């Protein structure tokens, strides 16, 4: 009976602590921040695709708790010039924002996404233009995958400001570029979905958006090739506890770095890191007053050469200077166009241009997998060839096909496209043998 008595006392003590609030975690805080939808409204999108995407954005925003001083939403169109359908703070409910999204018209014109991103940074996300300081900022870019101007540099500037970037592509575009443009990890922030299946990701994406806008959210800013700044809202005080901050390279779990910080700390700079590397960060609040869950984040440093430096406790120490990656040589230009042909229920042909010789390229990797999820497959194509036939496909299925050129310098360049196999032929009905006519003998074959 003694073990059961001890167990009962332990449970009673735990319940009493929970009722007193000593072990109770903080209540679920309402999301607060600025959410921008960047919608491809150019002529590269068909009217049908635009209507489906518009309905998708409306479904995303309808249940959101919009309101003054809380969560605000904005919609910007991508075209020859960016166009603001409605700015932050115009709508005080998700239903009103949904009605405005549904009433929006396609702008047509060129796909100047980079220009729209610069506009978003200067006119909407900048504090000088009325943006709220200290609140989470999220960008949801819905695109058909292509852009007439560079997207990488202006998108990186937004992420350096602390903007969390989600990307939804309807199946075309450069997979590597979109992965780099989205916030890390890409598997959480980048979605390739057929335009008729966008409803499948509504609930998951909305939940991810709300998680990114919680006040307790740990986030990274000032990301360079050799470091980044971590920031978080005040969760503790100097008297109520302390933080343990852990940094682990994703590919080297044994190379962890740890730092203990006082309870009144709200940021920290990690420096002296490797370029173009994923790091898993954990912020663990330790307190005897209340139980707080650890916060986990993955951050990818920018490409370039690592610079000297070490992390320091000074909030204003500043990150290491930004190292810009060298631009690829002209002869290292990757695939610029993909053509899908000879589509059969279980195969299709993929061609691309330009074709690169063995002097510049080692060859091509062609990766393909179902858009709705499934195992991806890979085919190797030697340099000098610019086509291959994909076999063993499923009838009536949409695939994402990515052609990656591997250069001798170690660089890679990729382009993605959506391909669909037709439905297979219906099986022919087997002939029913006819009964012999009365009075006649059946013939042997």
From Swiss-Prot:
**Glycosylation sites noted in the Swiss-Prot or TrEMBL record:** 264
* An example Gene Ontology biological process: protein homooligomerization
Matching entries from CDD domains are given as:
FN3 (cd00063)
Protein name from the UniProt record: von Willebrand factor A domain-containing protein 1
Leader sequence segment: 1-22
Question: Subunit structure of this entry?
Answer: Homodimer or homomultimer; disulfide-linked. Interacts with HSPG2.
In terms of InterPro entries, this protein maps to: ECM_Assembly_Org, FN3_dom, FN3_sf, Ig-like_fold, VWF_A, vWFA_dom_sf
In what way is this protein post-translationally modified? N-glycosylated.
**Localization (cell):** Secreted, Extracellular space, Extracellular matrix, Basement membrane
Domain VWFA residue range list:
34-213
């Amino acid at each position: 009976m003694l073990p059961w008595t001890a167990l009962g006392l332990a449970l009673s003590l735990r319940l009493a602590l929970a009722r007193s609030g000593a072990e109770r975690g903080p209540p679920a805080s309402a999301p607060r921040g600025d959410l921008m939808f960047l919608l491809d409204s150019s002529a590269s999108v068909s009217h049908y695709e635009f209507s489906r995407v518009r309905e998708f954005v409306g479904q995303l925003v309808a249940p959101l708790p919009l309101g003054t001083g809380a969560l605000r939403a904005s919609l910007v169109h991508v075209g020859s010039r960016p166009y603001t359908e409605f700015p932050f703070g115009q709508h005080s409910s998700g239903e009103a924002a949904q009605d405005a999204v549904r009433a929006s018209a396609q702008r047509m014109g060129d796909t100047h996404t980079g220009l729209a991103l610069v506009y978003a940074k200067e006119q909407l996300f900048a504090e000088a233009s009325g943006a709220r300081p200290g609140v989470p900022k999220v960008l949801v870019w819905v695109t058909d995958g292509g852009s007439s101007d560079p997207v990488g540099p202006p998108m990186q500037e937004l992420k350096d400001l602390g903007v969390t970037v989600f990307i939804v592509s309807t199946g075309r575009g450069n997979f590597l570029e979109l992965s780099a443009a989205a916030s890390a990890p890409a598997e959480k922030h980048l979605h390739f979905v057929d335009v008729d299946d966008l409803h499948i990701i509504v609930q998951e994406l909305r939940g991810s958006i709300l998680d990114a806008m919680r006040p307790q959210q740990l986030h990274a800013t000032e990301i360079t090739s050799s470091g980044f700044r971590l920031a978080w809202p005040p969760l503790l005080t100097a008297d109520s506890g302390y933080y343990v901050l852990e940094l682990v390279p994703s590919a080297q779990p044994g190379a962890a770095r740890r730092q203990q910080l006082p309870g009144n700390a709200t940021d920290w700079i990690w420096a002296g890191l490797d370029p173009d590397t994923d790091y898993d960060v954990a912020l663990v609040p330790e307190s005897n007053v209340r139980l707080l869950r650890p916060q986990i984040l993955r951050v990818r440093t920018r490409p370039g050469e690592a610079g000297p430096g070490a992390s320091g406790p000074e909030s204003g120490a500043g990150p290491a200077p930004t190292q810009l990656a060298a631009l690829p040589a002209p002869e290292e230009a990757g695939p610029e166009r993909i053509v899908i042909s000879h589509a059969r229920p279980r195969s299709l042909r993929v061609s691309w241009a330009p074709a690169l010789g063995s002097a510049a390229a080692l060859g091509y990797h062609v990766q393909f997998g179902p858009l709705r999820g499934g195992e991806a497959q890979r085919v190797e194509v030697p340099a000098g060839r610019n086509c291959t036939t994909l076999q063993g496909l499923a009838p009536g299925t949409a695939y994402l096909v990515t052609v990656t050129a591997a250069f001798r310098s170690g660089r890679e360049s990729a382009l993605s496209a959506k391909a669909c196999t037709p439905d297979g032929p219906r099986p022919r009905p087997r002939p029913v043998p006819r009964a012999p006519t009365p009075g006649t003998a059946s013939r042997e074959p």
